[in-house]
């Protein structure tokens, strides 16, 4: 009998077999896909940013270490704050 470490629908979460329920395994699959994906480095803009640990992201090219979200380098709240800061900077530059 051959055991698989993944399945077609659930992906890497197939290693749990029928345990824990389908919904949780699908959520786990989605999180694992996000955290193992390569992201663009904000310093050198090269797509080599990888997860080194919880909330720690390291660029393989320039060696930059960035603190981000647990599963993605930038969280939803971080994106909102970045946009707000950009708006403030733009409004100040228009006044001058």
Curated annotation (Swiss-Prot):
Cofactors demanded by this protein: Zn(2+)
Keywords: Metal-binding, Ribonucleoprotein, Ribosomal protein, RNA-binding, Zinc, Zinc-finger
InterPro entries: Ribosomal_eL37/eL43 (IPR011331), Ribosomal_eL43 (IPR002674), Ribosomal_protein_eL43 (IPR050522), Ribosomal_zn-bd (IPR011332)
Assigned GO CC terms: ribonucleoprotein complex; ribosome
Zinc finger (C4-type): 41-62
GO MF annotation list: large ribosomal subunit rRNA binding; structural constituent of ribosome; zinc ion binding
PANTHER family tied to this protein: 60S RIBOSOMAL PROTEIN L37A, LARGE RIBOSOMAL SUBUNIT PROTEIN EL43
Record-linked NCBIfam families: eL43_euk_arch, PRK03976.1
Official protein name in the record: Large ribosomal subunit protein eL43
Gene this protein is translated from: rpl37ae
């Amino acid at each position: 009998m051959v055991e698989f470490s993944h399945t077609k629908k659930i992906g890497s979460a197939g290693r749990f077999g029928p345990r824990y329920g389908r919904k949780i395994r699908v959520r786990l699959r989605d999180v694992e896909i996000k955290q193992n994906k390569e992201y663009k480095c904000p310093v050198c803009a090269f797509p080599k940013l990888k997860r080194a640990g919880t909330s720690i992201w390291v660029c393989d090219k320039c060696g930059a270490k960035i603190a981000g979200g647990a599963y993605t380098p930038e969280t939803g709240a971080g994106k909102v704050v970045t946009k707000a800061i950009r708006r403030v900077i733009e409004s100040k530059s228009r006044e001058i």
